[in-house]
Amino acid sequence: IDCPIQFNIKSNSMTNALSLIGRTEMLFNSDIKQHQNELADIISESSFLVLGGAGSIGQAVTKEIFKRNPKKLHVVDISENNMVELVRDIRSSFGYIDGDFQTFALDIGSLEYDAFIKADGKFDYVLNLSALKHVRSEKDPYTLMRMIDVNVFNTDKTIQQSIDAGAKKYFCVSTDKAANPVNMMGASKRIMEMFLMRKSEQMAISTARFANVAFSDGSLLHGFNQRIQKRQPIVAPNDIKRYFVTPQESGELCLMSCIFGENRDIFFPKLSEALHLISFADIAVKYLEQLGYEPYLCETEEEARQLAHTLPEQGKWPCLFTASDTTGEKDFEEFFTDKEELDMSRFTNLGIIKNDPLYEQELLSLFENSISEMKDERAWTKEQIVKLFFTMIPDFGHKETGKYLDSKM
C-alpha cells in the first residue's frame, strides 16, 4: 500500500522539529554567537579527523566544522551508505571548501584503518562519534562484546594513535546514561570515561554528555518517520520522559567541547526553561497532529496493526502507548551526579563537569585482561560481562528483567 504522505522531520523546517520537542529557539545560540569569531579562526587554521562521522551526531559535527572552512577535514565511518548521504548533504547545503575534504568507509577497529592512520595520521583535532548506543544491544553476549570493543577499546586505541601522531586534542561522546548507569550501554560509556582519565595524562581530552538527539538514526522518533512511510502504527512508552536536543545542537555541543573544553572537561546542556522533560507519547501526538492525523489509542499490538490498514483514510492514526518494562530503561535523566564538580558560569547554556585524573590502574588492567581472556576462549556469557561491569562500577544499577525492545513492536 502506498503511504498517503512521505514525511521526514529532518528535512522539514527546524521550527517543526523544535515545536515537537516543546521549544521555539535553539539552545546554544548565545554561546555560539559569543564565540563565533574564535571558532571560525581556530577551525580555518586546523585539521580535523571525525570518526563515526556519518551517524546522526557525526554528520551534525562534520557540518559544523565544514561550514567554517577547515584546512583539512577527513571523515571515517563504517556505513558506506550514510557516508554517501553526508557528502550529498554537504555539497547540496554548503558546496565546497578550499581545504582538503575526504571521506573513508572504514571500520575503526580494522587493520585497514590502522594503515590509513599510519599514512594520514596528522590531525590537530580528533573527534570520535562512533558508538553502539542502543540499550537493546545488550540483549545478547555477542553484540554486547562488540559494544565494549566500539565504546571502550576503539576509543582507547584511537586516543593512543592521536598521542603518537601529536594531535592537540581528542574529543569523544559520552552519554547522560553514564551518570549513575542502569544499563550496559551507559556502563560501557562510564568505563570508557575511566580509560579516558588514564590517557588524559598524555594528551588533552574532552567529552560531552547530552540528551536524546531528536530524530537521530535508529531513535524512536526517527522510527515515527519510518512507521508513517510504511503505514504502520506509532508505538511509544507513556511513562518515560527525556530531554531532547536537535541534531544541529548536538553538533554544536560537541564542537564547543572539542575546541574550548579543557583537559578532562565533560560538557552538557544546562537545564533551563527551554530544555525540559517531555514524554515520547506526547511527542508522538504532536507529530501526528503536525501531519494532520488524530491519534487513535489502541489496546494491543494486534489491534494497532489491523487498524493501520483502514484508519489513515479517516484522518486517524493507530497508536499504542504502554508502560516500559524492558531491561535497562532509565525512568529519568541526569547529566551529572552529586559527586561531580561543576563549572556553571563559563557558558550561558553549557555546563561543564571538571575532573581530576582519577582512575584505578588495577581495575583497568583487570578489565582489559578479563575481556581478552573471554575473546581467546571464543566463548562468554552475558552474566560474565555483567559481573565484570559490577566490579568496575560497584554502584551499577543494572536490573535484568529478561525483556528487551526487540521482543516488542
Where are these regions (language model features)?
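Flexible, Lys/Arg-rich cytosolic regulatory linkers and terminal tails that connect or flank
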Residues: 1-45
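Strand-loop microenvironment adjacent to phosphate/nucleotide-handling motifs in alpha/beta enzyme folds
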Residues: 38, 196-409
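Hydrophobic/small residue at the entry helix of a nucleotide-binding pocket
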Residues: 57
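Hydrophobic/aromatic anchor residues within beta-strands of the central parallel beta-sheet
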Residues: 103, 147, 205-208
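Conserved glycine-rich cofactor-binding loop
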Residues: 54
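Helix N-cap at the beta1-alpha1 junction of Rossmann-like dinucleotide-binding domains, i.e.
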Residues: 77-82
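NAD(P)H-binding glycine-rich loop region in Rossmannoid oxidoreductase-like domains
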Residues: 60, 64-75, 91, 99, ...
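Conserved Rossmann-fold NAD(P)-dependent oxidoreductase catalytic core, especially the SDR/UDP-sugar
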Residues: 1, 128, 132-193, 198
